[in-house]
């Protein structure tokens, strides 16, 4: 779902004259990092957050480090539905390798002295391509549970409050 929505969002933004820098598959903190690192004026991220499969939305923000509040999203919805937006010719640029830039930044700034064993349960969600690498990079011994990306979420929803996920973690601990 996310890929199709991402394409539509990019088409919509570029049709209003925006310059879109696509950093690829990411987590919310990575998007905020990218806004500062790439000196971007705004962010838009397609995310399901911790919703059930099929429930995807868009997180947006203009001020660095802040996302739109419900009132701002309502205003944006009205602008879109009433076609009260400007038209222009924007463009898109793929930022290759940004996942590695993000991981290296976190690893270089966060080393630990004491050995820590970390159980990482990602529910086959996006965190699985980040968390194990970052934690190993800072010096943790990582025990991975369901870290392979699989958008069908075969065992449980990747939500830290999901009881199946919590049970998997407690068994590993």
Predicted segment positions?
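Gly/Ser/Thr-enriched, mixed-charge loops and adjacent short helices
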Residues: 56-173
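N-terminal small/polar loop signature for handling phosphorylated ligands or for N-terminal nucleophile
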Residues: 1-55, 134-173
């Amino acid at each position: 779902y996310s890929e199709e929505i991402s394409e539509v969002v990019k088409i919509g933004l570029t049709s209003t004259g925006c310059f879109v820098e696509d950093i690829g598959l990411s987590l919310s903190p990575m998007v905020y990092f990218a806004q500062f690192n790439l000196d971007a004026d705004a962010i838009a991220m397609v995310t399901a957050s911790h919703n059930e499969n099929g429930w995807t939305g868009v997180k947006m923000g203009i001020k660095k480090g802040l996302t739109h509040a419900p009132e701002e999203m309502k205003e944006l919805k009205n602008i879109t539905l009433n076609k009260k937006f400007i038209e222009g010719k924007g463009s898109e640029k793929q930022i290759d390798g940004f996942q590695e830039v993000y991981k290296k930044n976190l690893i270089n700034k966060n080393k630990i002295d004491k050995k820590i064993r970390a159980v990482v349960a990602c529910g086959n969600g996006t965190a699985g391509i980040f968390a194990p690498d970052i934690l190993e990079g800072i010096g943790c011994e990582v025990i991975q549970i369901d870290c392979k990306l699989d958008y069908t979420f075969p065992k449980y929803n990747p939500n830290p409050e999901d009881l199946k996920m919590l049970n998997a973690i407690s068994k590993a601990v």
